[in-house]
Amino acid sequence: MKNSEKEIYFHVGLAKTGSTFLQNNFFPKLKGIKYISTHKYWRCINIIKRTNYKSYLISREFDRQFEFEVKKILKEFPQTKIIVVFRKHEKWISSQFKRHSKNGYHWSFEKFYNNENTGFWRKEDMLYSIKMDIIKKYSNNKPLVLRFEELKENPYSYLSKISNYTGSRYSKSDISLNVVHGSWSEKQLIFLKKFCSIFKKNPPEYYANNKILHWLLYRPWWLLFHFVMYFAYFLPKSYIIKKPLINKEYLSKSMKKYDNDWKKILSISD
């Protein structure tokens, strides 16, 4: 079979929109399509070229690498169709901040994201319309645009949209709706941030494409951070939390500017 005749579907995340659930609990259960797991993403192009399945599903969640990765896959397989999931901005940025906090970043939310656009997370990282423009730039096919909220509200409707789009099948009895990764509490994250501000000023580097360095230089810190958060579970809340991890009033005001961006997503979501 020619590569140009193969049907290819590319789930691009975003991160913190239920990607891990899909990658562990749903995509492997789909019938009638070859799923290339996130661990094999780095060689997915070679896998597709060297095998002869009728259709393939690739999955990997992106944030700042979004355009680079979309361009890379579409350059090799222009027929690729994109699956993208968005989440309300307020919930999404909160979840991103918590993810960075548990990975050793000990800055405040205001340094992570602020209205002056001088934080680690910038306005251009927040605009979903920019990501849709990137998809349109490289793909001539209509993407499947989903809302993370629907996964919570009506999971089987959400999952069926993916199976229908990809021409695959699944059985409800095969799907576990259990959360893959539970979230850490505010108390645990605050305690870890205090720990890192003293003992680990710079977060450990993540080696996505080097397993040896990943286990030698990143994984030990990952394990220590988890131990610290487990320890914090037993400490009094009043001892740890002097102020909220995220100021809700500040967050709400900061996210107002993205109301129209979210409305655009609602208007095109499937």
Task: State each model region's role.
Residues S4-D270:
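Anion-recognition interface
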